[in-house]
Design a protein with these regions (language model features):
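An N-terminal hydrophobic leader/cap segment in hydrolases
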Residues: 3-51, 56-60
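Alpha/beta-hydrolase fold nucleophile elbow
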Residues: 130-141
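Hydrolase active-site cap/lid region
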Residues: 144-196
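Short alpha-helix in the alpha/beta-hydrolase fold that links the catalytic acid
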Residues: 84-85, 193, 202, 216-225
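Catalytic histidine-centered segment of alpha/beta-hydrolase-like enzymes
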Residues: 238-246
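Acidic catalytic loop of the alpha/beta-hydrolase fold
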Residues: 210-215, 240-241
Length: 246
């Protein structure tokens, strides 16, 4: 009986640690979008967009005639305003980013389902507003998972991934290295990009860097292998935050 009691205690603490670590990591990840502030120094003036009564975001070159529209899904801290303000003018076409439900001015609760909903509703709005344009999906870091999801459920011209991951355990394990193998079961709202990749039929371009210490070059090679039709480019001296500055 003592042995059984001992193992039950171990199991109890194992579960407590697993679920607690997941809660902490998810809270941190979401806080980057919920609590991020607008940056003061921007290169391009973002235009506020209300996609529907509860979903908002920003865009640039919204009136510019173009055969392409870029839908951008950002990494941590790069809310829609910041993404558009820093990166949008580097592209000679319409550039749009939405804030996930439950963040910034978008109402509701942030979770996996509403992040996916954000993506599809952003796409549907863009398709309606720009019916003649090809839609290109771009994702960076945390945003690459939802970008991959969208490319698998909607028709897009191409998908660009900068510093991607296979599921969020690749991110969580950088800080709390416990979510390996079957222990990934503790992760709630897991963005399973490797599974989404199986549904992507458009050309995919994966970008990494030997200088990226957050989501490294070797991981990007594994990410590229998840797709049926992908190309990969590894740079030498690009940091994790600077891919779109190339």
């Amino acid at each position: 009986m003592e042995i059984i009691r001992f193992f039950l205690i171990i199991l109890m603490w194992f579960l407590i640690i697993g679920f607690s670590c997941n809660f902490i990591m998810q809270t941190i990840s979401y806080s980057f979008y919920k609590s991020a502030k607008k940056i003061n120094e921007i290169s391009y003036e973002p235009q506020f967009i209300k996609f529907n009564d509860t979903l908002t975001g920003y865009g640039y070159n919204l009136e510019k005639p173009s055969d392409r529209v870029i839908l951008f899904f950002s990494g941590s801290n790069y809310i829609a305003y910041n993404s558009v303000g820093i990166y949008s003018g580097k592209f000679d076409c319409t550039f749009i980013s939405a804030d996930y439900y439950g963040t910034q001015h978008s109402k509701g609760k942030m979770n996996l389902k509403t992040m996916q909903q954000t993506a599809t509703e952003l796409y549907d709005w863009a398709e309606k507003e720009y019916p003649q344009a090809h839609i290109v999906i771009m994702g960076h870091s945390y945003g690459t998972g939802i970008a991959t999801y969208l490319a698998g459920v909607r028709e897009v011209q191409s998908l660009f991934i900068a510093a991607g991951y296979r599921d969020v355990s690749d991110l969580y394990n950088k800080m709390v290295p416990i979510f390996w193998g079957p222990l990934r079961i503790f992760i709630s709202n897991n963005i399973q990009a490797a599974e989404y990749a199986k549904n992507v039929s458009c050309p995919v371009y994966v970008i990494g860097s030997d200088s990226d210490t957050t989501l490294n070059a070797s991981l990007q090679k594994k990410v590229a292998e998840c797709f049926n039709n992908s190309e990969i480019k590894i740079f030498d001296d690009v940091s994790h935050e600077d891919y779109l500055s190339l």
